[in-house]
Amino acid sequence: MLITDKLLLSYQRCHLRAFLDTCGDWKQLDPPSDFLLKLMRDSATYQQQALEDETYQQPYYPRGDWEAGAAATLSLMQQGVDRIYRGVLIQGEFGQTNGATTSLVGIDSQYFPEFGELPETPVHLSSSNLPSSNITLISRPHLLIKQPGQSKFGDWSYITADIWLSKRPKQEYQIIAAFHAHVLASVQETMPEAAWLMLRKKGWWQVNLDQRTPQMFEILDDCIQMIENRDKPEVFISRQKCNLCGWYTICHAEAESIKHLSLLPGVTASRYARLKTLEITDVEALANASSELLAEYPEFPDRVAFDVVQQAQSHLLNQPLLREEGSSATDFVTDVTDRSSATDFVTDVTDRSSAANTVGDLTNLTDVGVRKERIREEAEVNQFIILPEVVEKSLAKVNLVVRNTTENKPATSSIPAPILRNKPIPYSQSVFLPIAPIELYFDIEAEPELNLDYLHGVLVVDRCNNTEKFHGFLAESAAEEGAIWEQFLELMWTYPIAPIFHFCDYEVKTFKRLAKLYNTPAYLWKPVLKRFVDIHKQVTQKAIMPVESYALKPIARWLGFDWRDAKANGAQCVCWYDDWLKTGDRSLLEAIVRYNEDDCRATYIVKDWLTNFLLKHEP
């Protein structure tokens, strides 16, 4: 049986992923997205930058021939080379499975070498019995660093160091460091004195091997048992961890086919484990469960039990439900996203001699910016809108013009909310969203690695004249960020009392950041900030919807809205903008603006739907 450091890393993130990496059909893997490839390049670049002042040697061997790699590495260690980059360490009988030599090409990655092609010789361990007495461990630390001390080589030994793009010393990285140390000890016949991680911003970070080694052995043993017994783990969809995984499509299809509870917002792995002990394993059972019973368990604190049961009821009925006061989806939904943390979840992807390693734990960047922070009190939402007392009136549906630059279908919309009613909505009824003659819908596109917010998109909806106009303030380079900030502010003051609707709190945080960065006078930005209304916050506080996630795309698509570019999402826009800076291809900017406009329109659709929904449930 062949166990590599990359397989062990996959196992820590998802047992099923590790199982499929070894026993699955590689032909079913999803092709890598542009964003995944970008993250891989970023990780490789970071490693190169970290090593630019280092003097090192690297073993050379045919791609995928780990036995040759181990021999070349051992030769460098015997010579006493100070730094060895991407060495190969092997413990156990190499390449033996039931007495027959097994190729290792492709064994430790999901789908493709760094440059994108599929492995030439896929390995299917499921076709063989895997005796636990015949285990080969393969470790490939980023650096082997020479230290004083006795080993079989002489009066020197080696320690390991891994270079991660992450800002944090995650436990999974520390476990891999302990794995490296264990295999290294068998090679040099002495336990390394230390193991290190090099992290972005934190720099060098020492792993506590006394703490992590026992944990590593427990995880390693569980992984070996799973593969040895070919015990396929149960599917579980976790949007934070699954979105960039190459097995996502087949796993999601399996989950959908059985209506797995992990598809419900709020059903985390720990909560699902508790539900299984209560024999609640399907949507119908959860919909009929007692929230009072669930609330007795620590996995369901406060109102989470009631919310989860309601969520199941909404899915079972395939219709939205009114959320009771004091309850909020943001209190129990964990499939949230964060633009600033994407690179924290990049695995090591610089090994040019093997299939590219997968990226795990990445938050879903396709709908950017869901966070829990409360931005302001509910009462502030309605304080600036006056509703005239005239007859009820409905607006026509939005008609979008398809640009000639795309052949994709135009965005579609649901029925807009009425601007007026037979009686005005009292200010005290905070359950209602503002309905104003002119409304602004705002969305930002950003490049996190450059700390650049390069596009402010605003849809101006004039309900009195039944018109809509989109404004895209685009910075074609970082130098133009300040200029588009001023242009955006000028538009906000063109409509000095219009509410500004956005989805999630990224826009608010960025608005504050830019005001500070460009020394904007308080009188120009603080009154504008008070006009912001977070539609995500309103939806999650007021409604239970039959969606997999309370991100913008699942909600808007459930309402019938479609983005014109099926491929487009926030992560793809990061790639497009990065490519624009390199190539100057203006079609990339047009695609970004088109996507941003559709995000604004989707926010408009969700806001109008929610307004109508709340009006319908008015007491």
Each PLM stretch: what is its role?
Residues Y248-P265, A269-L278, D282-E476, E481, ...:
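C-terminal extensions
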Residues M198-K201, V207-I258, Y272, V283, ...:
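Acidic, Mg2+-coordinating catalytic module of metal-dependent nucleases/exonucleases
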Residues L51, A181, K512, Y604-T611:
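Short, amphipathic alpha-helical segments that act as regulatory/interfacial helices
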Residues D65-A68, A289-S290, A379, E389-S394, ...:
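Short linear loop/turn motifs
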Residues I84-G95, V105, Y111, P131-N134, ...:
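Conserved DEDDh/DEDDy metal-dependent 3′-5′ exonuclease domain
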